A protein has these predicted regions:
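Conserved residues at the C-terminal ends of beta-strands
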Residues: 51, 139, 215
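Surface-exposed, active-site-proximal loop segments in enzymatic domains
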Residues: 103-109, 144-159, 195
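Short, well-structured secondary-structure segments
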Residues: 111-116, 134-153, 180-189
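Short glycine-enriched loops at secondary-structure junctions
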Residues: 139-144, 249-254, 372-374
Length: 419
């Protein structure tokens, strides 16, 4: 799903009611699925957590405690985050798993109307066990932005910075601490000062945080483009600490829409286009040329576009001496396609055709994702989806795609997790 938090911002509950944003609705929780027979041991590199009401409790400086974002419940309308006086409804797409598809909507729900694994780490582990997921890398909910954009948008910069740090503390101290080998630690960045951003990466790396979620296209969220040198301290810190940069589709707060009249399903069909465009920008901004050990992962990207893109990158090299094009590539040893294959990883939950040509893509750069608990999620049928896509591949490729590549990338001790 795409981060579209701005659409739910309103001033009062009454305005919600007037707009008709909250209506009578069914609230059904499905029974637990039967535990799957595990054939594929999956590391999911793209799931989401819906943050609990206690997110900021005890984690902000005393002078900011009274301004802390908090949950406000309004019966029967739902639970809302109040952030600097603005109410954000918890759209139920943030917790669709375990609920009937015909009840999904953008309307706010209450925590107790959601499957507990959506926000409780112990129950998340149980839901992972039901589907054969041995480890999970998460992103924030849409409330805070898949790349933590909400913190940079807070009017009080000091409060935004403190909340960003508190969020990262919660991930380490509560979410990941429940089982650090399975709930892989992540962090959100600070966008307004790259020295602070670098220090935060270093602070978190020192306590075992493996990755940082970042915007696929920061220019679209009001920040300098990837072609500026603004981001250098942040990228340097990520490279030096081995912190993986995770780029989720929609983390630029937009998805592809061919025209103003395009229906929503057109954008859904084009989800992979965001990652395709972003990957080319990250490549030709030459970020991985300047930082050759940087690890960049695209989440919810799909892999179907990769054969075409790799072919095209190789083809356009024939024009490198064409003076009118003024090629900007500076690496004298590696061509763009070589750097692309070296520094980028891509994730998918459903690309059966592309898996037929995975060796041309490079199996070592393909990762699996489950996207729990979003509407696109393949939970609980993770094993079935894997079997329909992977059963015809060799065991070394299956093992690499389902868990081996992710284990190497995020330093996950999978040998202790596969039973």
């Amino acid at each position: 799903m795409t981060d579209t938090t701005s659409r739910s911002e309103v001033a009062t509950f009454e305005e919600l009611q007037v707009r008709g944003a909250v209506r009578d609705r069914k609230r059904t929780l499905l029974p637990d699925p039967a535990p799957a027979e595990v054939k594929y041991h999956v590391v999911s590199v793209d799931d989401h957590v819906l943050e609990p009401p206690t997110l900021f409790e005890g984690r902000l400086p005393a002078r900011l405690v009274d301004q802390a974002p908090k949950i406000v419940r309004n019966e029967p309308r739902g639970d809302f985050w109040e952030i600097e006086g603005v109410l954000e409804g918890m759209g139920d797409w943030n917790g669709a798993s375990g609920r009937p598809m015909n009840e999904w909507s953008t309307e706010p729900l209450q925590y107790d109307e959601l499957r507990r694994g959506v926000w409780d780490p112990k129950e998340r582990l149980r839901d992972m066990d039901l589907a054969g997921i041995i480890a999970s890398v998460c992103f924030p909910s849409g409330i805070w932005g898949f790349a933590g954009q909400k913190f940079m948008r807070m009017k009080d910069r000091d409060l935004g910075l403190a909340c960003m740090r508190a969020y990262n503390d919660w991930v380490v101290d509560e979410w990941s601490a429940t089982d650090p080998s399975r709930l892989i630690s992540f962090q959100v960045p600070w966008y307004h000062d790259m020295e602070i951003a670098a220090q935060e990466v270093e602070r978190n790396a020192a306590r075992g945080v493996k990755c940082v979620t970042f915007s696929e296209n920061p220019e679209k969220i009001g920040m300098p483009s990837l072609y500026s040198n603004y981001w250098e301290p942040f990228f340097r810190a990520c490279e030096e600490t081995g912190t993986v940069i995770n780029l989720h589709v929609g983390s630029s707060s937009q998805i592809s829409k061919p025209s103003k009249d395009s229906p929503e399903e057109a954008s859904l069909a084009l989800f992979g286009a965001n990652s395709m465009l972003a990957s080319i920008d990250w490549l030709y901004a030459q970020i991985p040329v300047r930082f050759p050990k940087l690890k960049i992962v695209y989440s919810e990207s799909g892999i179907g576009f990769l054969p075409m893109l790799l072919d095209r990158l190789e083809h356009i090299q024939m024009y490198r001496e064409y003076e009118l094009l003024q090629f900007s590539w500076t690496d004298k040893e590696l061509a763009p396609v070589d750097v692309f294959r070296r520094n980028f990883w891509f994730s998918t939950f459903w690309d059966p055709i592309a898996f037929g040509v995975i060796e041309s893509i490079g199996a070592q750069r393909v990762l699996l994702e489950v996207d729990y608990p979003h509407p696109d999620s393949i939970w609980p049928d993770v094993q079935g989806r894997c079997d329909r896509q992977l059963s015809g591949l060799s065991k070394p490729i299956i093992d690499a795609v389902t868990h081996g590549n992710a284990a190497a990338l995020f330093r996950i001790p999978v040998e202790n997790l596969i039973r």
